[in-house]
């Protein structure tokens, strides 16, 4: 590692720590090494579960997953925050309590089934310990917002019978509430924890291995080679590389402080305003979570919640994601034109072809993963195979580098490829056998041992990265458990439906505001789970297709990280851009306009998310409806960009910008004759632009 690269890595960790107490590396102390190896064991356990090397009852598997999260999370938080001896001891006590709960769930699994509905005193004690340890871990890791929200739901379950109608319920005994929240599959160990223990953890590990293997460098070099030389190339590199990296990164905020270390200074150096540079990076990094084929962790929870294949979620997200990044590209292009910013020079750009020639093998696991997902395999199977192939490529590369000639290396890769294809006939165990042989071989020489160390570090880093996601999933299960027990979702849903009877648009705005307010203090995953559980059924009752209603909630949960006053992704970019987080947030909202507009358009015309239904599809047919709504969205985004930036080949007068925004708004609105008005205003605007250019050229 060069000194410059080491400095950049250290700077990235320092910035990440401002937003994530677990961002720093494992300390070199004895405690740090113990936690490092505990993280490795955690990852190996999850891989063994995914590959069915270890088969546990679903309830036990979830409990052990949460036990690992607490056992690793508390001590790491104590080290990361520099706690003194008393608080450190308390953290270790809470970690031990979390392990004890997992052990109790495992040992008492069968007796607990027989005692369902009639818990004894130890059940209640361990149930309370489970709730307390998860609440405290979430508070320490993510701040008070999510624990307070979950605490209010818990208080509602215990005391809601004292509220006035229609918010009251029949009342539930303390024992019943504890059993609902701490046992079974509708509380802490509900669907979110199941998804965390399977899909999410596996894909976080997959991303960790790819990052260690050099995927960030590959994405950056390819992006530079493809768009770096074009007008505003520095910002376009940010949009492309951050969006690509966001597809394999579990956190948009982490992506900001990782890729932003390179892209934000690059944009500033080529003339972009600091606030705009930070806004572009924040927008692109958050957009990675909605970009198929490998979307953020929420996509897996959505598929599991809706009971649909992952490919259906990908299909619904495809067109909106393309529009999101097309809008970002358009905005940075206009900003560059307005300020006369050129692309990068040839000397500063790597060759995209050379980058792919050198790192093409890194794309193979991602390609196989995508193929498996699109072929109907479960995300768990696809993620396991993708992770195994990544490990094989990393280890195989280390072995191939020591071979004497190109011919021998070619033969080696052919043989390894044939061995990898054996999983079609013999399953994952064939890949595990090949991996075992590669590990033993790498252990026999120095370069191989260094590669094994990289894999070991990837296992540890992946487990650490999964901690906030897993703990958030466990805690948000409290809300699901309370809503299932009390039927609280029906109360809010009836309110949404009553509003929607008069105006569907007002119902959508209310849901959007709920998502954004919740997202100001809690991560995307619990935000989605809460709002989809409460508002999703209501939107469905109003005639919104199921997957469209969930995508609506999903989008605004992500966009909450760009929305002031909290705007976590923007404040993560602030120290890099050396600009106010609020200023960056306002710029990010402009760049991310598509993210705010497309969900509304999709509700009225589901064809935008490649879904059946809607008046337009019924009138003109499915594919004509898709083409029409995409065209309308593109025109609206183009007009919005021209209005906001104030430039379209030339500076725009204020009245021209007013016409542009009026045309964009009427194209987006789903009211009688608004399309006709929008296209008429667009035609007027186009004539004005044509006349203006004619006068300039004359």
Regions found by a protein language model. Give the residues of each.
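Membrane-interfacial loop-to-helix junctions in multi-pass transporters
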Residues: 121-125, 186-199, 225-238, 270-276, ...
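Core transmembrane alpha-helical segments of multi-pass membrane transporters/permeases
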Residues: 136, 140-141, 151-166, 174-178, ...
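Long, contiguous bundles of hydrophobic transmembrane helices that form the permeation core
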Residues: 2-33, 318-464, 568-668, 693
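Loop-to-transmembrane alpha-helix initiation sites
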Residues: 123-126, 168-180, 193-197, 315-320, ...
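Transmembrane alpha-helix boundary signature
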Residues: 80-83, 102-117, 141, 161-175
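Transmembrane alpha-helix interface/packing and boundary motifs in multi-pass membrane proteins
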Residues: 207-211, 242-251, 283-289, 373, ...
